[in-house]
Amino acid sequence: MLQSRVHDDPTEDTEAFKQAFRRHAAGVAVVTTLLPDGSPAGFTATSLASLAAVPPLATFNMAQVSSAWPAMVPGNRVIIHTLGPRSRQHAQRMAADRDLRFAGDHFTAGPHGIPVINDVTAWMLASVIEVHPVHANAVVIVQIEDGALGEPDEALLYHERTYMKPSGI
């Protein structure tokens, strides 16, 4: 049975909101880009969604305090990587210390010099076409321009603060 609660204290509602979304499994992606100074930036996203097939559009959400935020302007490009369980370490790395995200040999320079993460299920080069700030966050809309498929793998999901793969019903 669902429990319904309305609280006078907004921090309690915030905690209920967070708990509800922890129960919502989401696919895991990594977004990489280049900052205005040419240095790489990236982050893990669980908000990736397709928006349209014609033209091919996708969306993701991000915090405006993200190290990649300065690159989110119309006309700039990003590479969106979809992940499987064997590439879970990329999700963890891109969600951790930003100074270590591009330390190592887990990526190569891709189109326009943007990092392409190795061993992902797919990657898509996209151009930022719209950015919609919402409070301290933003919805970013991109148009897919190119991409490639990697080796098949199951989906990587994030659920209850844990990375996992789907199981059959």
Spans of features found by a protein language model:
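Basic, polyanion-binding surface patches
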Residues: 1-169
